[in-house]
Amino acid sequence: MTTIRSIDFETTGIPSEADPQAIVEIGWQDIEYDGMGWAGLVPEGRGSFLCNPGRPIPHEAMAVHHITDEMVADASGNVGLIGAPDYFCAHNADYERQFHNPGVPYICTYKVALRLWPEAPSHGLQFLRYHLNLPVVSAEAFPPHRAGPDAYLGAALMVRILEEGRASLEEMVRWSNGPALLPRVNFGKHKGAKWEDVPLDYLEWVANKSDLDRDVKANARHHLKARAA
């Protein structure tokens, strides 16, 4: 049986080279997967704890997760306590990876959802909860933007992904290590168009001459390669 640990971090802010930021809360929910289409949540494999970030929590971050300096003043949790399962998963796992990258493979449920359900109007975790009618216990998924409930909801999404059976764990890890494969253009004169409908010369400009971000340029290269196949 394979253990996949869904995790979520609440933090002091978005990390950068100049300011790595810090974790204020960690949540997790374990999933067991038999490799043949069955997956389920582990009732006793769930929890959350607060972490003292060693710095004041900005009000902008408090406004998202409602964790205050007073709440974490005596917290003793640290990221090492979440252990080393067979896989980690997280929604927008690139974010969690910036705070914890122990060598365990990560699966990004956001990047996988983009590939499995490209026509979904949104791929945010809360939207997918309702769009896919995930069988969650509402009290366990509340409040949003707290680490325990978000890890639980992310695990429910991961179970649905595994039940779909459309990609192996290894394939999902590969997708997660690459760019987010966006279904539609989200900028410029072709905003809203499907990438496969964008003119070839525009794809070439995005891929080779623009200063757009890594994911956007990778999307253009992906579709250029697909057309050349």
Give residue ranges: language-model regions:
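Short intrinsically disordered terminal tails
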Residues: 1, 228-229
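Metal-dependent phosphoesterase core characteristic of DEDDh/y 3'-5' exonuclease domains
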Residues: 2-6, 18-67, 83-193
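Short acidic, Gly/Ser-rich segments with clustered Asp/Glu that frequently serve as metal-coordination loops
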Residues: 9-17
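A short, well-structured juxtamembrane/interface segment
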Residues: 68-82
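Acidic, Ser/Thr-rich low-complexity intrinsically disordered segments
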Residues: 177-218
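Charged, low-complexity intrinsically disordered segments and flexible loops
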Residues: 216-228
